[in-house]
């Protein structure tokens, strides 16, 4: 059985139209993973073997001058000098709405991550991560795809200036889940499930670095996810505690929400 679930993720309540037919273009000659692996040049080695040897880029999809990056995530943190994705990592934890400054050593902020899983519900990033191969990964400025091997899920995404479209194809006859969490290292944030509007909404408060380190910056990263398929189960979680049937949760380490979808014998979108 193969089932396809599509999600529309909206930032700041701005909608986007469906993507159309993909045509051959020069975009597919651009590999956005460039800079995510450590440099082996003599000059790079002179500066050290930590973050200095990386380009601190990320394989993001977005429109030119877009407000948000959309990137696969292999690092579960918004910590300073830690990019969301590194080529050497072996597991993908989800797909992040990121504000990472490419080429810098600052921090990500106001971000959120969503991840499809199947079979047993695994919701924490360190538990739900799936093995993947770079040979089964496509990374261009307009389109990203990868096979999540642990779940036999083919994940695709494309970005607009303030929104993204995801398509997840579940290839196994197992329970199909979607996990969503705000990425707050400070244990702050909020998330709620609206089964009437078929939405997951939330925010991740931004915190300062350098002057006033750790203090609230006075604004949040807000997100809205719209889903199309009917759900059979929903709930929230906080770290290792699961709350089936609960619609909202706020503040705490490792908070998030999950949905379990109805899967039919025929393909659904």
Pin down the residues of each PLM region.
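Positively charged n-region of N-terminal signal peptides that target proteins for export
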Residues: 1-4
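Bacterial N-terminal signal peptides
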Residues: 6-16
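Bacterial Sec-dependent signal peptides at the C-terminal "C-region" and cleavage site
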Residues: 14-24
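Accessory carbohydrate-recognition regions in carbohydrate-active enzymes
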Residues: 22-269
């Amino acid at each position: 059985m193969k089932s396809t679930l599509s999600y529309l993720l909206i930032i700041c309540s701005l909608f986007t139209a469906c993507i159309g037919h993909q045509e051959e273009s020069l975009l597919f000659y651009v590999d956005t993973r460039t800079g995510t692996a450590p440099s082996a040049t003599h000059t790079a080695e002179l500066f050290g073997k930590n973050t200095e040897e990386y380009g601190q880029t990320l394989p993001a999809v977005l429109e030119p001058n877009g407000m948000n990056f959309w990137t696969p995530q292999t690092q579960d943190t918004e910590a300073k000098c830690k990019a969301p994705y590194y080529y050497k990592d072996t597991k993908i934890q989800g797909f992040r709405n990121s504000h990472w400054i490419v080429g810098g050593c600052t921090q990500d902020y106001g971000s959120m991550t969503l991840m499809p899983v199947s079979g047993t519900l695994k919701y924490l990033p360190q538990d739900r991560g799936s093995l993947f191969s770079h040979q089964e990964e496509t990374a261009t400025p307009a389109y990203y795809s990868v096979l999540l091997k642990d779940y036999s899920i083919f994940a695709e995404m494309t970005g607009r200036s303030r929104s993204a479209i995801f398509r997840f194809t579940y290839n196994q006859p197992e329970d199909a889940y979607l996990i969503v969490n705000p990425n707050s290292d400070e244990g702050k944030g909020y998330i709620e499930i609206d089964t009437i509007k078929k939405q997951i909404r939330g925010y991740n408060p931004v915190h300062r670095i350098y002057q006033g380190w750790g203090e609230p910056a006075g604004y949040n990263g807000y997100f809205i996810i719209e889903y199309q398929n009917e759900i059979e189960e929903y709930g929230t979680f906080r770290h290792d505690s699961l709350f089936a049937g609960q619609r909202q949760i706020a503040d705490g380490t490792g908070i998030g929400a999950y949905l379990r979808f109805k899967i039919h014998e025929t393909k659904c979108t």
